[in-house]
Regions:
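Catalytic domains that recognize anionic headgroups
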Residues: 1-287
Length: 287
């Protein structure tokens, strides 16, 4: 048997406790199966009953397609937090964020503890200790920081992060017709590239834990329901649900591919990190 020493990531936000040590002792040994694990985050994806209640959007076809493939879809689920950094730092460290943390949640100031806790988290640390490779996919946004333990990093970023491009588009540079400064095109490139690369994960011989953060259907919307660039004139809500439909299509295709190509049945988790967030409203952001 191999002894797996568990270190204590999570930074100062999640210091180790006695209960942690009791749950996973340092001499813990694991010799069971190691299926590939996929943790797929769809940023800003609403719960299906909330879509229907407030916007009369029927998402039942997608939900039923998941259940037919063996997924459990949790009813009435909701995020514990209303922003990506808070939500992911909590889930990846399997703990609530301390209530006395000095963070401005409305203006997203002093988010460094959350960013560090996402990059150096307990889930990845534990899985790597028992022999998993860590595959990380994101748009390089700070809220989904990859940390120092990544074995395979999937990114289509060439010049600047999506957030940097957003800032640049607020300056005089916004008039330059460069793809690297085009937020919509960059989002499209990142997402299409990400789905393509995830299809290659089942080819890896070693067991993998894949964390994949897709900035969809989060604003700015970059896809209509057919995968094309959204047309001008549609409302934010219409654009949001069009991108939901395209996200549904891509997730279904990806799940089918992973299930077909995996020698050992994988574990696949698909979730939203928070609810719908329009630029001028935080309505239903937790659901």
């Amino acid at each position: 048997f191999v002894s797996h020493k568990i270190s204590s990531p999570g930074g100062n936000l999640f210091p180790p406790t006695k209960s942690d040590q009791n749950a996973i002792p340092e001499d813990f040994k694991y010799t069971g199966p190691k299926p590939d694990i996929y943790y797929i985050i769809l940023d800003g994806y609403l719960r299906d009953d909330v879509m229907n209640k407030y916007w009369k959007f029927d998402n039942s076809e997608f939900i039923q397609s998941l259940t037919k493939r063996g997924f459990y879809v949790a009813p009435k689920s909701r995020s514990n937090y209303t922003t990506t950094g808070f939500s992911l730092s909590s889930s990846l460290n399997m703990k609530y964020i301390p209530v006395d943390l000095e963070v401005d949640t409305s203006e997203h100031l002093n988010n460094t503890p959350m960013i560090e806790a996402v990059g150096e988290n307990r889930v990845v640390n534990f899985l790597k200790s028992i022999g998993y490779l860590y595959v990380h996919l994101s748009d390089d946004a700070a809220d989904s920081k990859k940390g120092n333990h990544v074995d395979i990093s999937i990114t289509n970023r060439k010049y600047s992060s999506l957030f940097s491009q957003y800032l640049l588009n607020k300056t005089i540079l916004k008039n330059l017709k460069l793809n690297s400064l085009d937020v919509i095109q960059t989002k499209r490139n990142n997402i299409l590239y990400g789905f393509k690369k995830l299809e290659e994960i089942p080819k890896i011989d070693e067991p993998t834990f894949t964390f994949a953060h897709f900035l969809m259907p989060h604003v700015p919307q970059a896809f209509d329901k057919n995968g094309d660039i959204p047309v001008e004139g549609k409302s934010d809500v219409e654009k949001y649900f069009d991108e939901v439909l395209y996200a549904n299509k891509r997730i279904t295709l990806l799940v089918n591919h992973i299930l077909e190509k995996s020698e050992t049945p994988p574990i696949i988790l698909v979730q939203g990190d928070h609810g719908y967030l329009a630029e001028q409203s935080t309505l239903l952001n937790e659901e």
